[in-house]
Amino acid sequence: HGAKCGVVVKQCEDELAVANMAIGAGHAGVRAMCGTSGGGFALMTEAIGMAGMIEAPVVFIEVQRGGPSTGIPTKTEQADLNQVYGASQGDYPRVIIAPTDTTDCYYTAVEAHNLAEKYQLPVTIISDLLLSEHPETIEADALRHDVPIERGEIISEWPEAEKGQFTRYALTKSGISPRALPGTAGAMYVATTDDHDEEGVTISDVFTTTSVRRKMQEKRMRKMDAVLAELPPPKLEGPPDADVTLVGWGSTEGVIREAIVFLTRQGLRVNHLQLKYLHPFHSKEVSEILRNCKRTICVECSYTGQFARHLRAETGFSVNRLVLKYDGEPFEPHHVVQQVNAILEGKSISTDLTMDEAREMAYHYIRVHLADKVRPAKIEMIDGDSEKLWLVEVVGRESDKEEGELRIGVETGSIYSWQPFKVMSVGASSG
């Protein structure tokens, strides 16, 4: 459908090529975007800094999955936040947005392109595998096509005899300089990854002009004031005098809302703060909301609570507790409900292996070592030497006869032993 829609979709040889080609397209005047997951984004980060330096509009989509490295590429997580914040070296203007559902993804993409072109900077949409791949039913008229398109100021010509040399990076009060597409009459300039003066002439080859560097860096970063003013601040959902405030970001919005329904039925007063615009951040507005909350719990899919740390860095506010998940599966409402109740009851959140998890670990061992010829049956907890154990009875898939026992650590999850009751044939099945 590319020709019909006026869109070019290109599969490049690697992530470096993708990022640089998208930036080049944005520089040339095309609305350009590219998408990747965490590993690919790691390779793109130097190029993203180039977009910040040459002030090229471009949109990146970073879909988080379980890491580090290849990790679990078919499972979800929210643990790339530090990487997205730290993309490329140095300070440069950029926007980071975390959409909350499928419909929001559509409008966020439109908004991202408008921001990129209006303010001449890179925009990163940070999603996750759950949001990027799950099916979702929406209303037929939820996605409108009459969306606003804002391309920013693009000059069509530059009368050099009248105005002098074109200053692509003019030091303006707004920080936004006149943009000319390649080939514009009279508007020749140099776009380079080195810092430069107003005409694009580099200031770091032979000598570094510190005053030019300072004013150029201030000019670039001035854009962020206008960007922040344009982005809508977050709003607190629910009763203002709630006993508990659940804080989330990105794709956790739906599951938090559903969990609140169940918590409300239990008699709790719960409200909800969901953050979408991560950079620039509405520090003042968020601080005012949080300091009036009685008890705050941050819900996110990461081990270290990356968003809670970012929240503290931006506002100085530390949430009271964390509800975390990092097994690759998304939150379901009961996960949030159970952990919130445990926190309110003063209980520690257990990381011990549950019976269901022990069954899953038994299935994994069987697939790897026993050629799927058996299955876990009865499971019970017993005492062990260094920790309690899950004793898993293993039976034949077809015969249902006892074939052996697995012992799995309740605390560590370690497979301590497999004890067959008789010698088994574990070669590849003919099926």
Regions found by a protein language model. Give the residues of each.
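Thiamine diphosphate
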Residues: 1-86, 95-116
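Short, non-transmembrane alpha-helical segments in secretory-pathway proteins
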Residues: 349-381, 430-431
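A short acidic/small-residue loop/turn micro-motif
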Residues: 421-425
